[in-house]
Regions:
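N-terminal cysteine/histidine-rich coordination modules
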Residues: 1-22
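Domain-scale terminal segments
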Residues: 24-141
Length: 141
């Protein structure tokens, strides 16, 4: 499986497809999330990891999103988007969940196994040691 990855910088970390489903607002706060939301890089914005898999651009604005993506895709059987969206506790339908937007060719068991293996390798390269909150973009700039 050919895999390429790079970083871009965006205005808002919430633009990543998994951001809404991973970072849950802490009650009675405006800007606190569990897991923590990423911090912007001064004068650049929020680092977005782009991973190209089988012609599909996967985007992540925080290591927690990448970890969640890997964790979901490694499950056997693959959970449904309805099961995953119900965990958010809101009346949002499963059609808006990132898993429902993932192309079918990437949901096949063998494709998922390969993708999880490679995404773990990418994670080892782009997540700084000692911090699971931010990507290490310095090696790629």
């Amino acid at each position: 499986m050919m895999l390429k990855h790079h970083f871009t910088f965006e205005k808002d970390w919430r633009f990543a497809p998994a951001a809404f489903w991973v970072h849950i607002p802490t009650p009675n706060t405006e800007r606190e999330f569990a897991p923590p939301a990423p911090e912007p890089i001064p004068h650049k914005g929020y680092a977005f990891l782009h991973v190209e898999v089988e012609g599909v651009d996967l985007q992540f604005s925080a290591p927690a999103q990448l970890d969640h993506f890997i964790e979901v895709l490694r499950r056997k059987p693959l959970p449904t988007s309805r099961q995953l969206s119900s965990k958010r506790g809101l009346a949002l339908g499963p059609n808006g969940h990132w898993l429902s937007r993932l192309p079918a060719k990437l949901k096949a068991p063998r494709a998922r196994e390969k993708m999880v293996r490679v995404l773990r390798e990418v994670r080892a390269k782009v997540v700084g040691t000692g911090s699971d909150i931010a990507f290490n973009t310095s090696a790629f700039m």
